[in-house]
Amino acid sequence: MPDSAPILQVENVFAGYVKDLDILQGVNFRVEPGELVAVIGPNGAGKSTLAKTIFGLLTPHSGSILFQGQNIAGFKSDAIVQQGMCYVPQIANVFRSLTVEENLEMGAFVLDQPIQALKDEIFTRFPKLAERRKQRAGTLSGGERQMLAMGRALMLKPSLLLLDEPSAALSPILVNSVFEQIREINRQGTAIVLVEQNARKALEMADRGYVLEAGKDRFEGRGSDLLNDPKVGELYLGAAKAH
């Protein structure tokens, strides 16, 4: 990646859901402009906690989170959205009672401008959503809901997209489709943090990756290097290798 200031820099962050009980224990993490960075690790490692802390759903107990040069630690999520970061959670990531089109409109809630062109861009990117634009989101398949959640986030043209377990509960075919969309979003210049349980697939597409364990960043490196690291493979990729 080019030599430039990181778009996101997490420095020595401690965070958790209860005061004095830290799940994240001194995590350091960075994303360069335009990078796709994977965050992998076993269940309970703190991956989703890291995503929620970055996006302001949890306030870090200590440490800093610099986004585009500004310390956003302690900011509310709506303020972080306006700074240019969007988040797609693992579950409850669409408004099931609203139509596909209404979901996209909800994604543009902070914009004071016409949004039809933005919706058209999303429908061009996700043709299946265009076909179902008047259907309620609750009637969509799991893969279609994931595409809708990403599409809603992209309505704001974020500088950084934070994805929490986008492959969760999807069939292998749908996983491939969703991951190809993630690749394409990144190719077009959006930096992506991919928090993902499917470690092998995440590292295959990542510029760099981090391995979390027990709330600490145990390994960091290029995605290809982590894939080929015997220790990472033994500890975290064994199940994936068996398939």
Question: Residue spans of the language-model regions?
Answer:
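The feature captures the beta-strand-to-loop junction immediately N-terminal to the Walker
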Residues: 40-42
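Catalytic Walker B motif of ABC-type/P-loop ATPase nucleotide-binding domains
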Residues: 161-165
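A short, flexible loop at the N-terminus of ABC-type nucleotide-binding domains that lies
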Residues: 2-10, 14-26, 33, 57, ...
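Conserved catalytic motifs of ABC-family nucleotide-binding domains
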Residues: 157
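Conserved ABC transporter NBD signature motif
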Residues: 63-71, 83, 115-117, 121-124, ...
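ABC-type ATPase nucleotide-binding domains, specifically the catalytic core motifs of the NBD
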Residues: 18-19, 100-117, 125-127, 237-241
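ABC ATPase C-loop
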Residues: 153-154
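Conserved ABC ATPase signature
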Residues: 136-140, 144
